[in-house]
């Protein structure tokens, strides 16, 4: 009679833990997460500073934002090659006594309509240098393309979609020097298809760019938006005294 040798379950568990601890990185580009937070009674400003510094030491770009309005008191935006470092940042934020009341997960990407764009422009989208100097007015919102029967973006021919997006991009380029925009992809990762992060010199620039681009057909007919969050980019050492 033959006998099968079966490893004890603990060895399988050990192997799975080892594999799970490996970096979780996109094949191209970077992972991006936006955390929107409110302080709990256990809030510890020094612990928040330590969490941010630890993440930065691990190679994460961290942008801290003093938020306006009731939705959140602080936003922490993390950009990293390894999602596990973003998870460590999330844990540090929570251990500092901040309750995460909303969040958004996405990846840097280049548009399917960007064929022929210079390599340096493509790299700027995949590996952005953030935050931009002098642009401390900050806004984030998620969006998707409409899928209604009459206005279904995904049933349009590629050339038509490209034409509409080129028109949309032309409107955005009129704000060069005033706005830095980061569009990140989130299909299959979060509730919408893209996340849009805007940096501006003045808050009215944020309002004007969104208003202007709403008139483009790609937005007016085919776009759906989630909640908007607005705040001011603020160093974490200052931010902890504003929470």
Question: Where are the predicted features?
Answer:
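Short, charge-rich binding segments
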Residues: 67-68, 95-96, 130-132
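Short, solvent-exposed beta-strand edge segments and adjacent coil->beta transition regions
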Residues: 32, 71-73, 136-138, 191-195
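Short, glycine- and small/hydrophobic-rich beta-strand elements in well-ordered beta-sheets
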Residues: 53-75, 100-110, 168-192, 209, ...
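A structural feature that tracks compact, well-ordered secondary-structure segments
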Residues: 35-38, 65, 77-81, 90, ...
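Catalytic micro-motifs at enzyme active sites that drive phosphoryl/nucleotidyl and oxygen chemistry
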Residues: 21-22, 60-66, 88-91, 127-129, ...
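Short S/T/G/P-rich N-terminal loop/turn motif that feeds into the first structured element of a domain
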Residues: 3-54, 81-85, 103-170, 187, ...
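Short, surface-exposed basic-aromatic patches at helix termini and helix-loop junctions that form
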Residues: 89-96, 214-218
């Amino acid at each position: 009679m033959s006998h099968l040798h079966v490893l004890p379950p603990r060895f399988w568990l050990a192997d799975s833990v080892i594999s799970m601890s490996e970096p979780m990185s996109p094949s191209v580009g970077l992972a991006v997460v936006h955390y929107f937070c409110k302080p709990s009674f256990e809030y510890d400003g020094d612990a928040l500073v330590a969490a941010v510094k630890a993440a930065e030491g691990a190679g994460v770009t961290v942008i801290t934002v003093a938020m306006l309005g009731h939705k959140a008191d602080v936003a922490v935006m993390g950009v990293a090659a390894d999602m596990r470092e973003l998870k460590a940042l999330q844990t540090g934020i929570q251990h500092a006594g901040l309750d995460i009341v909303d969040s958004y997960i996405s990846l840097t990407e280049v548009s399917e309509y960007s064929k022929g764009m210079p390599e340096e422009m493509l790299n700027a989208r995949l590996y952005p240098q953030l935050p931009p100097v002098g642009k401390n007015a900050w806004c984030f919102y998620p969006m998707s393309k409409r899928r209604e029967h009459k206005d279904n973006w995904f049933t349009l021919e590629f050339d038509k979609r490209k034409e509409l997006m080129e028109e949309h991009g032309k409107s955005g380029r009129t704000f060069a020097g005033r706005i830095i925009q980061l569009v990140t992809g989130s299909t299959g990762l979060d509730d919408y298809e893209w996340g849009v992060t805007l940096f501006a010199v003045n808050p009215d620039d944020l309002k004007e760019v969104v208003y202007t681009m709403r008139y483009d057909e790609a937005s007016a007919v085919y776009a759906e938006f989630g909640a908007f969050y607005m705040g001011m980019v603020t160093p974490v050492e200052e931010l902890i005294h504003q929470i």
